[in-house]
């Protein structure tokens, strides 16, 4: 054991600072002095002096053991002189005095689990055997509790040991692989005789005269004679002489127990077999008698001078006469499995028999000849001591019921002064793999509410989860069913974790299957059961009552965190998936404001703050710490200010909960092996206890890191630890099924109590100061507004300054700022480029970059602190800015006559409303299960085609606000502002900070003619200003879009980035998002996953959406773009709909080709780079919430979107925030060669369905036809996005670099005098539509406008020739037009077109736009009426002849309209006239254009046919 290092335990005076982090751990750069100590109010004046190692080991003593690990009679023995019973419990020998109910303990200093023990005949010594490699046979002094002798002679474990009656010899038998049988002269520590036994030996027994001993096992009964072996006067080891018993026809039996006769039966030997046979051998080793016990299985045997006791299954112990083998009686059975011990208040309760009850098997027996007591150990790890003086009146002397399998968690019941307590003071709870939760209390004083039961003096109550008793019996007892060394078998069942609510009324527990249960503690009834996770629940945590909220967070091995609201009957509030691996601990912190901290096996710690929105509470990530080691557990001190984390490298790291900074790092284990598994801070915050995988426990000073005490005794890893609230005990539980209660020394207890008094005194002073300052108004709430969730910047007052001021209240509040600075979009690891890297780059004199402006948002420092992406697309949610920059100058006729009367009547929205009437109020289909919540700031491209605006903010939260028509925006239009970076040849100087205003105008070049290159290019710093609109605010012009970055933190040049790529392999990129809340799933989901847990629905929400998308036909919406900004419009009210936004999985850079030129008349559809993405939004990609998002603009005006919600579509296997911190990509700064470069970086995936392959083929037809040889810019290969559907395993990889670049070229209207008509595509079928919606990169054709009689035909309808090189431009509009938008397009000259369309100038049409709008409005209304009529006819149960005829006519009309549309869209393609069909069916997907490869075309056509057939079969099945 490592000695305690120098340095002393006593602290210095109040002026002492916390020492810097230990050697080997780099201190944070920029710190000129070590971090200060915690406030003086948290210092402990009572000090413990430096102590020796012996004192350290003796400061904590083992008071009580609740558990037993005896597997057979070899693990149970009795002192023949005193009647004390000794049994095994891990690495401890428990010596029990049944009369006094007191325990003594002998510790195995080797820390190996004990396998066998036996008392010496005089009761002064105990011999033990061990498990493991090179086990020892040890002799212990019972009185002194120390080791007398140690004998090494085995290799693989000791199965059984015994003293000879004359105490000269000790016999030890090894396990089967050891095969060694040794006879020891234990006083001389030598082996007298030895031999090898090839079969497995289970038990042995000495004869009364010590002349021989008998071993039994598999087909084995052998007599070993000591006198013949030891008569030879040879000092060396001699062979042990043995003779086999003559078994006769019983030679194939497995014998599990043996006992040599006593008294007049001294010459006989009794054996029992597993098959239930009791055998008697005479002095000549001949089988003399045998009887059938009439049981299915027997396991153990014990004899006295007069009686024989045989332990059998089902709690049976049969009693026979020793001299005649006559059956006398049975012992009373113990409790039945599943008994409610709390009801056993009367002794007669034990003898009540329950019909069809199952009783535990008997596994070990020992007899006390002094008191005539028989001790029995049962298979469920219970112990009974029976008084058998009169076998006709057997009485119970003592009993105890222990856990029979892994004990996973322990919780101490909180203390209450009033009558609210459901349990007596000092109670604690344990849970185990035996599927029970047990309530214990060590207080011997009687309690009126909890009377002591007859089964146990310490066990108050047992909760059998779901009344499951199949795991109560330990399956590792019998050698033919379990492990030989007696290690408990992990059956992957039972309760894994639990937590008591702060009010003491509820108990939350999570099992190993992922279920979450809530029990109320008055009557132990199960209130709630939630199928929460897909894997075992690893941690549960209730929020602190000081926060004003009652939340329950559950985290699991499935890497998800579910936050439940207790006050709302445990409804789900949020699901977080920041972690990329198992979550090992989760804690709530904060007194007035609430924080959530979690750590996991992905080496990440996430600090989150709560934000209250209109739709509930949401946690937003504020800090992310990425360590280099796995984090196994953590705990928070009483001040809620520090969190201690147990790390795999055996260190305890202490972090500040406010800013996430590491404050301390010290050793958590005194050994040199293993990992820290658990950490727990005592109730006073003075000490912390740690457990290591070497099975040791340490008590450490929380502030100095000095080891105060260290203990051992468990034979398996310690799974949980808790200090009691009275500061007297530490309770530990382990995988060895034992619960250890450790008594803390008086010096430790006094320190803890003194510290609590100091804290209480400080709180009283603070309360007095608060009353004095009560005149000052102060907002007191448990959460802060979204705009106040900010990290402290280096220029602001730090937490260390707050410590020096000793203001705990202000210190524990979430820091807030008056300004509306945006949060950093990506939270990266700390530190900067190392010095050696700077020297190689020649940046030795680079400024440290710490002198930021105090108003800048927090920027992490470090060599990985690179912005994951460039400036993202961003929204303006301020009314003045919206009116100023985006409100179009509408013609009076259009504004007055048409637009005011238009209503949003798209087909998809109508169908979605009719399909989900219960969701009509919220405006999204019922099958959309869960909105993806994320607690991070990310960069997204979002396109809103309807009333709901979906974008991302930089405030680390996604929100949604319904768009309402305001005074200046009567159409309820949705707006989007686009920010972008400049291309390589127009990038600003490196030292110039890019403001938001600088980046806004750069996007105009996509829509305006490209001017000649500027010799000194810079972005325009002024925004367009229209008459009647307020100009841009000063905040808007000065606010940076992202955090200001020091020049030494980011690669500023291509050379720097190449250097980073070379030395660091990858660069940090933006983290991914999370899915959202779940709703009840439908019956169809049982086909995919019968167990529909919250996590399952969370991860499969996009799969469900993709399965149902084909039932919703495409919408007809069109967006208009006004240069230089992007305006997304929706003609309609404020009711939000799903399927209107798309969240880019990674990031998108849109680089401007030139400066903006304002033209008020330059209205045109958006460029293909936007419409292609906006058109392919899946129906489930937008799920509305009601949260508010702060914006970096002034106060928003009601009626406009104040917040947006941007759920993304992450699959289960995609990178999370923590994984992206280590596996990342970067966009090379020197790879852009064209005037326009767009990078759509998406993770690799497989196609999610066969229909997706079909849609991909149609996309490729349009894309490959549009590519031109002149596009030579280097584009990245786009990767296909995964929606979590694993049905299709095909891997289709296509290189579309030139196509993607071509899509972002300026439209052809950049060439003066060139205008071409827009090209339309045929409407996709519902099957095709569903396939198209699956793609994040799909290019969906637009729906054409139906030809109406009032609309004159176009003069010409040219054919579509092949692609012509050299024609710049983009692809056709890929958005589905609304009626108003079509009227605008057809009433004004088209300004852009496809690159392959011949260049022809077309005269404008004289048609009035208002007339077009009226026609389209009537068309929509009529079609809707026809559709409603058809739906009624189809849904009616009884169909007469008239209804059938009407149905047929409607179908025929619909098909005729469809064929006419196809004939008009597919120019030059002959379409057969529609034929009436008896029932509607989905039309076959039209072929757009021939593919370049015939093989690929055939493959895609084949997959398309398969998909159509599958959909039809599914439709017929429903």
UniProtKB/Swiss-Prot annotation:
Signal peptide: none annotated. PROSITE patterns: WD_REPEATS_2 (PS50082), WD_REPEATS_REGION (PS50294). The modification N-acetylalanine is found at residue 2. One of its GO terms (biological process) is centriole replication. Its main location: nucleus. Residues 908-920 have a biased composition (Low complexity). The modification Phosphoserine is found at residues 33, 49, 52, 501, 944, 1070, 1093, 1101, 1123, 1144, 1228, 1248-1249. The modification Phosphothreonine is found at residues 46, 50, 1053, 1268. Residues 797-809 have a biased composition (Acidic residues). InterPro entries: Quinoprotein_ADH-like_sf, WD40/YVTN_repeat-like_dom_sf, WD40_MABP1-WDR62_1st, WD40_MABP1-WDR62_2nd, WD40_repeat_dom_sf, WD40_rpt, WDR62, WDR62-MABP1_CC. Residues 762-772, 810-824 have a biased composition (Basic and acidic residues). It is found in: Nucleus; Cytoplasm, Cytoskeleton, Spindle pole; Cytoplasm, Cytoskeleton, Microtubule organizing center, Centrosome; Cytoplasm, Cytoskeleton, Microtubule organizing center, Centrosome, Centriole. Can form homodimers (via C-terminus). Interacts (via C-terminus) with MAPKBP1 (via C-terminus). Interacts with CDK5RAP2, CEP152, CEP63 and KIAA0753. CEP63, CDK5RAP2, CEP152, WDR62 are proposed to form a stepwise assembled complex at the centrosome forming a ring near parental centrioles. It is linked to Microcephaly 2, primary, autosomal recessive, with or without cortical malformations: A disease characterized by microcephaly, moderate to severe intellectual disability, and various type of cortical malformations in most patients. Microcephaly is defined as a head circumference more than 3 standard deviations below the age-related mean. Cortical malformations include pachygyria with cortical thickening, microgyria, lissencephaly, hypoplasia of the corpus callosum, schizencephaly. All affected individuals have delayed psychomotor development. Some patients have seizures. This is WD repeat-containing protein 62. It comes from Homo sapiens (Human). The gene is WDR62.
């Amino acid at each position: 054991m490592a000695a305690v290092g120098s340095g002393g335990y006593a602290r210095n005076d109040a002026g002492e600072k916390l020492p810097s982090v230990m050697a080997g751990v780099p201190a944070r750069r920029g710190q000129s002095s070590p971090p200060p100590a915690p406030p003086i109010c948290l210092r402990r004046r009572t000090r413990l002096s430096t102590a020796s190692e012996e004192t350290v080991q003796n400061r904590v003593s083992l008071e009580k053991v609740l558990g037993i690990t005896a597997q057979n009679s070899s693990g149970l023995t009795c002192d023949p002189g005193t009647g004390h019973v000794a049994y095994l419990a891990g690495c401890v020998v428990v010596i029990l005095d049944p009369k006094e109910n007191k325990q003594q303990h002998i510790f195995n200093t080797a820390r190996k689990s004990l396998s066998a023990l036996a008392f010496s005949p005089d009761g002064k010594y105990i011999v033990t055997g061990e498990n493991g490699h090179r086990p020892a046979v040890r002799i212990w002094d019972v009185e002194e509790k120390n080791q007398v002798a140690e004998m090494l002679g085995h290799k693989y474990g000791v199965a059984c040991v015994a003293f000879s009656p004359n105490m000269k010899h000790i016999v030890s038998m090894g396990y089967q692989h050891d095969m060694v049988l040794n006879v020891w002269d234990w006083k001389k520590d030598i082996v007298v005789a030895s031999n090898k036994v090839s079969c497995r030996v289970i038990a042995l027994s000495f004869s009364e005269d010590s002349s021989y001993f008998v071993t039994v096992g598999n087909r084995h009964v052998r007599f070993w004679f000591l006198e013949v072996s030891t008569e030879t006067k040879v000092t060396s080891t001699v062979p042990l002489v043995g003779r086999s018993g003559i078994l006769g026809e019983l030679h194939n039996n497995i014998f599990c127990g043996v006992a040599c006769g006593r008294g007049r039966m001294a010459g006989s030997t009794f054996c029992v077999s597993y098959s239930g046979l009791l055998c008697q051998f005479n002095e000549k080793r001949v089988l003399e008698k045998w009887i059938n016990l009439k049981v299915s299985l027997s396991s153990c045997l014990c004899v006295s001078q007069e009686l024989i006791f045989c332990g059998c299954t089902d709690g049976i112990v049969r009693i026979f006469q020793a001299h005649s083998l006559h059956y006398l009686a049975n012992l009373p059975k113990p409790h039945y499995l599943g008994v409610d011990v709390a009801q056993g208040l009367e002794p007669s309760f034990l003898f009540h028999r329950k019909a069809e009850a199952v009783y535990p098997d008997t596994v070990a027996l020992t007899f006390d000849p002094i008191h005539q007591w028989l001790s029995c150990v049962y298979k469920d790890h219970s112990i009974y001591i029976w008084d058998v003086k009169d076998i006709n009146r057997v009485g119970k002397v003592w009993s105890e019921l222990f856990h029979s399998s892994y004990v996973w968690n322990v919780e101490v019941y909180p203390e209450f002064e009033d009558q609210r307590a459901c349990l007596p003071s000092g109670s604690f709870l344990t849970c185990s793999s035996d599927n029970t939760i047990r309530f214990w209390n060590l207080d011997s004083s009687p309690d009126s509410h909890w009377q002591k039961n007859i089964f146990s003096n310490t066990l108050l109550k047992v909760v059998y989860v779901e009344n499951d008793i199949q795991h109560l019996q330990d399956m590792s007892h019998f050698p033919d069913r379990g492990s030989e060394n007696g290690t408990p078998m992990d059956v992957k069942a039972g309760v894994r974790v639990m937590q008591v609510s702060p009010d003491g009324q509820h108990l939350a527990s999570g099992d190993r299957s992922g279920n979450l249960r809530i029990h109320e503690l008055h009557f132990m009834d199960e209130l709630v059961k939630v199928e929460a996770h897909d894997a075992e629940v690893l941690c549960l945590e209730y929020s602190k009552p000081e926060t004003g909220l009652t939340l329950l967070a559950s985290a699991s091995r499935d890497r998800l965190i579910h936050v439940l609201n207790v006050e709302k009957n445990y409804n789900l509030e949020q699901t977080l998936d920041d972690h990329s691996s198992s979550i090992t601990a989760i804690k709530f912190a904060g007194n007035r404001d609430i924080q959530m901290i979690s750590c996991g096996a992905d080496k990440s710690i996430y600090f989150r703050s709560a934000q209250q929105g209109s739709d509930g509470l949401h946690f937003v990530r504020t800090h992310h710490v990425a360590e280099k080691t796995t984090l196994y557990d953590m705990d928070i001190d009483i001040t809620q200010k520090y969190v201690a984390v147990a790390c795999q490298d055996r260190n305890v790291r202490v972090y500040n909960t406010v800013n996430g900074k590491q404050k301390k790092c010290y050793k958590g284990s005194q050994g040199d092996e293993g990992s820290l598994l658990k950490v727990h801070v005592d109730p006073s915050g003075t000490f912390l206890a740690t457990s290591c995988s070497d099975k040791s426990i340490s008590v450490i000073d929380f502030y100095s890191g000095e080891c105060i005490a260290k203990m051992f005794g468990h034979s398996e890893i310690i799974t949980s630890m808790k200090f009691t609230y009275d500061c007297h005990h530490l309770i530990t539980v382990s995988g060895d099924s034992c619960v250890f209660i450790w008594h803390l020394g008086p010096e430790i207890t006094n320190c803890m109590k003194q510290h609590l008094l100091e804290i209480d005194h400080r709180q009283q002073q603070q309360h007095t100061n608060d009353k004095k300052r009560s005149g000052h108004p102060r907002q007191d709430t448990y959460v802060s507004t979204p705009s106040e969730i900010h990290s402290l910047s280096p220029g602001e007052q730090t937490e260390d300054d707050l410590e020096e001021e000793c203001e705990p209240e202000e210190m524990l509040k979430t820091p807030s700022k008056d300004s509306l600075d945006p949060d950093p979009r990506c939270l990266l690891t700390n530190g900067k480029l190392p010095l050696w890297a700077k020297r190689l780059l020649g940046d030795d004199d680079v400024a440290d970059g710490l002198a930021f402006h105090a108003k800048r948002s927090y920027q992490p420092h470090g060599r990985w602190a690179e912005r994951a992406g460039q400036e993202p697309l961003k929204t303006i949610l301020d009314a003045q800015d919206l009116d100023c920059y985006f409100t179009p100058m509408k013609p009076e006729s259009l504004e007055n006559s048409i637009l005011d009367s238009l209503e949003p009547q798209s087909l998809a929205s109508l169908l979605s409303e009719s399909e989900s009437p219960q969701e009509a109020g919220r405006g999204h289909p019922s099958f959309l299960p869960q909105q993806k919540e994320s607690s991070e700031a990310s960069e997204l491209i979002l396109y809103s085609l309807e009333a709901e605006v979906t974008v991302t903010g930089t405030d680390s939260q996604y929100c949604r606000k319904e768009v309402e028509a305001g005074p200046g925006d009567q159409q309820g239009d949705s707006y989007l502002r686009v920010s972008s970076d400049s291309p390589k040849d127009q990038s600003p100087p490196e030292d110039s900070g890019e403001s938001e205003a600088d980046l806004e105008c750069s996007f105009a070049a996509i829509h305006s003619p490209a001017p000649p290159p500027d010799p000194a290019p810079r972005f325009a710093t002024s925004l367009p200003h229209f008459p009647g609109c307020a100009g841009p605010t000063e905040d808007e012009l000065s606010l940076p879009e992202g955090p200001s970055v020091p020049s030494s933190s980011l690669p500023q040049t291509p050379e720097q980035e190449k250097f980073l790529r070379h030395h660091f392999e990858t660069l940090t990129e933006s983290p991914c998002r999370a899915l959202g809340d779940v709703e009840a799933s439908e019956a169809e989901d049982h086909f995919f996953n019968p167990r529909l847990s919250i996590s399952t629905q969370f991860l499969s929400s996009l799969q469900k959406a993709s399965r149902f998308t084909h039932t919703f036909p495409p919408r007809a919406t069109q967006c208009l773009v006004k240069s230089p900004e992007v305006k997304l419009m929706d003609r309609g009210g404020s009711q939000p709909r799903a399927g209107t936004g798309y969240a880019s999985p990674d990031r998108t850079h849109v680089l401007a080709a030139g400066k903006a030129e304002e033209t008020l008349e330059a209205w045109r559809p958006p460029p293909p780079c936007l419409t292609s993405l906006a058109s392919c939004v899946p129906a489930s990609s937008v799920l509305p919430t009601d949260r508010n998002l702060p914006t970096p603009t002034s106060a928003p005006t009601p009626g406009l979107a104040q917040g947006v919600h941007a759920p993304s579509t992450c699959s289960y296997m995609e990178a999370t925030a923590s994984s992206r911190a280590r596996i990342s990509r970067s966009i090379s700064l020197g790879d852009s060669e064209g005037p326009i470069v767009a990078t759509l970086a998406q993770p690799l995936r497989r196609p999610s369905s066969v229909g997706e392959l079909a849609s991909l083929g149609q996309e490729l037809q349009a894309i490959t036809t549009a590519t031109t040889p002149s596009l030579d810019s280097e584009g990245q290969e786009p990767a296909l996005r995964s929606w979590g559907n694993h049905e299709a395993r095909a891997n289709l990889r296509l290189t579309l670099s030139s196509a993607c670049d071509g899509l972002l070229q300026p439209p052809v209207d950049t060439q003066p005098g060139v205008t071409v008509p827009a090209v339309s595509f045929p409407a996709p079928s519902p099957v095709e539509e569903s396939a198209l919606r699956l793609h994040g990169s799909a290019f969906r054709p637009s729906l054409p406008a139906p030809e109406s009689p009032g609309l004159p035909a176009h003069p010409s309808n040219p054919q579509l020739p092949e692609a012509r090189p050299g024609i710049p431009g983009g692809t056709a509009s890929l958005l589905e037009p609304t009626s108003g938008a079509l009227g605008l397009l057809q009433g004004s000259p088209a300004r852009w077109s496809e690159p392959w369309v011949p260049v022809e100038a077309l005269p404008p049409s004289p048609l009035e736009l208002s007339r077009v709008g009226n026609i389209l409005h009537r068309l929509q209304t009529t079609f809707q009426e026809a559709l409603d009529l058809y739906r009624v006819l189809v849904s009616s149960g009884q169909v007469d002849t008239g209804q059938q005829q009407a149905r047929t006519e409607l179908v025929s009309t619909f098909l005729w309209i469809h064929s006419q549309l196809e004939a008009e869209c597919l120019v030059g393609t002959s379409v057969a006239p529609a034929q009436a069909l008896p029932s509607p069916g989905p039309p076959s997907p039209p072929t757009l254009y021939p593919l370049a490869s015939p093989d690929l075309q055939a493959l895609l056509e084949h997959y398309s046919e398969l998909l159509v057939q599958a959909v039809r079969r599914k439709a017929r099945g429903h």
